[in-house]
Amino acid sequence: MEKSLFVFISGSSGVGKNTVISKLMEKNENIEFLRSHTSRPPRVDDKKNVYYFVPSNADFEKLINDGDILEFDYFSDHYYGISIAEIKSQAQKGKIIIKDLTVLGVSNVKELMRNQLEIVSVFLTADKAVLKDRLIKRKTDKAEIKKRLKEYKHEQNQMLSYEYVVYNNDLDKTIAKMEAIINSSTNHLPILALQSCQQAHDKKIEKYAAKLNKGKSLKPIKVVALDGRIYLIEGINEYLAHLKTGKHINLIFTENYKNIKPEENNLKEFEKLTNLYRK
């Protein structure tokens, strides 16, 4: 049976995680939401198939102590978490399973289930001014807005641990990027290149490979989404160093590029390069 792809999304409050998830689920019936367990009482406005309700905090704590909960958070006097049973159940459906998680939650799931699940992590962010405007429109308390904007810089520093970074300044463009990520991940499609392969240099590749092998992070590699595929536009040497070492890199979607069509010769040359350096 085909395994499911788990797409975990993190980001600041107000960045639009729930909106993006809802839109993706509307457009693709193969995408399902990963249900959480919670100890808070049900609400009238709760959406269907979002939570499994646990009677009390004590009952939830028993699940934790019994090792049934993979990842959890305590918020507003109640527990929220994902059960191992739910993860394993969804893993065999051959679906795209999507869920918003905290940075710590994504880290925990990766650490504990990396060898059992196919996981892609996305850090959803937005320009600070856009985020502030959204919080104001949501009638968020001024003190809370100030607090969240203060946390913005710290949250931005977390994005390097994710496979992809997507700026949600425009919803339609964000959905196109997310669809490219999902398409590439489910179909195991390689990243293609708009950047000229003539800019690939052995010495630079070796330098970046040495950094990665020492556990150092490289600057995010810039990519774009075109027709459901992911194209590299800057960072070819860093990307090839990643293939050579098998170490983690960070791909960030950008819109600051000239709208040029991929050149067939460059795509073929890039395929040769990736095959040469792929570990």
Language-model regions: role of each:
Residues 98-103, 115-138:
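Conserved phosphate-donor/acceptor-positioning beta-strand/loop module used by diverse small-molecule
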Residues 12:
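P-loop (Walker A) phosphate-binding loop of NTP-binding proteins
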Residues 38-97, 103:
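ATP-dependent small-molecule kinase phosphotransfer cores
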Residues 186-274:
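Short, charged/polar connector segments at secondary-structure boundaries
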Residues 18:
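Walker A/P-loop
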Residues 140-181:
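Small-molecule kinase domains that catalyze NTP-dependent phosphoryl transfer to phosphate-bearing small molecules
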Residues 15:
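ATP-binding Walker
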Residues 9:
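Hydrophobic anchor at the beta1->P-loop junction of P-loop NTPases
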